[in-house]
């Protein structure tokens, strides 16, 4: 595993790197990187970070899950912290890159254990919509995020499920199929930010085509660059006429 920083590493090379880690160490649970098509769902997020947040900034991967986004942040040269209610296998690799990790307690579901005005950015990758499932709520979580952000710091929320997503609607009808209990629209996003004093900078829908379904296909299909490019282009085209039915929102807000 390379420990070079992303300053000299294009996003495509980073994706290849983390896919190789998943292939070599499958117990790390980096399931999103079992196929090139599914791995590409994060390219837009990587670009947002590189465009909005300067190198060496302090960034929190809030609800870091299996640690895949923390790995990107570290490779990109950010001072990276992670927070989760559970530890994860991949952390032993992240620790080689000066990673700070704090574990939360389920009896304090709303608390983020960092001091006021600590971070230049806090990122949620598919986390904010789950806080009610662990005894919290969106407003209290956003108030905590506001507290730990530096003045002018950014909250970047990615993979925030769209209320009218066709994928979510179908998934909810299939027994034992994963879907999100809580989904949102633009008005709800603005309301959440207004109630927590966060200034909305950008809101957009994305992701009309499914991605994770590719993970269990043969390697010759799921990791084919031509197929991946066709899928990416199709997804980009379809998001315009079918934006309302896209799977997710992303929004960027500032303290």
Q: Where are each of the predicted segments found?
A:
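A short SAM/SAH-binding and catalytic strip from SAM-dependent methyltransferases
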Residues: 121-136
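Short, solvent-exposed loop/turn segments at secondary-structure junctions
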Residues: 65-69, 86-88, 128-129, 162-164, ...
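Short glycine-centered segments of the SAM/dcSAM-binding site in methyltransferase folds
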Residues: 58, 152-154
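Conserved short-loop catalytic and cofactor-binding motifs
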Residues: 33-34, 110, 129, 133, ...
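Conserved N-terminal segment of class I S-adenosyl-L-methionine
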Residues: 1-115, 121-125, 142, 246-249
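S-adenosyl-L-methionine-dependent methyltransferase catalytic module, highlighting the catalytic core
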Residues: 103, 132-144, 154-254
């Amino acid at each position: 595993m390379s420990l070079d920083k992303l300053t000299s590493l294009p996003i495509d090379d980073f994706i290849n790197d983390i896919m190789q880690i998943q292939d070599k160490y499958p117990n790390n649970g980096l399931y999103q990187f079992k196929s090139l098509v599914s791995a590409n769902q994060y390219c837009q997020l990587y670009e947002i970070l590189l465009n909005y947040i300067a190198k060496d900034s302090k960034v929190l991967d809030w609800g870091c899950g299996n640690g895949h986004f923390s790995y990107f942040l570290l490779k990109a040269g950010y001072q990276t912290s992670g927070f989760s209610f559970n530890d994860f296998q991949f952390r032993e690799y992240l620790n080689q890159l000066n990673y700070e990790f704090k574990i939360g307690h389920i009896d304090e579901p709303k608390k983020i254990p960092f001091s006021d005005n600590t971070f230049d950015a806090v990122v949620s990758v598919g986390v904010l919509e789950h806080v009610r499932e662990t005894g919290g709520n969106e407003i209290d979580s956003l108030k905590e995020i506001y507290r730990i952000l530096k003045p002018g710091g950014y909250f970047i929320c990615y993979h925030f499920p769209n209320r009218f997503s066709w994928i979510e609607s179908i998934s909810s009808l299939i027994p034992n199929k994963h879907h999100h209990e809580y989904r949102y629209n633009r008005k709800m996003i603005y309301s959440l930010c207004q109630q927590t004093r966060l200034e909305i900078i950008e809101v957009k829908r994305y992701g009309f085509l499914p991605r994770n379904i590719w993970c269990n296909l043969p390697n010759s299909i799921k990791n084919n660059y031509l197929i991946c490019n066709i899928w990416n282009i199709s997804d980009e085209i379809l998001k315009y006429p079918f934006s309302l039915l896209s799977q997710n929102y992303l929004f960027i807000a500032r303290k």
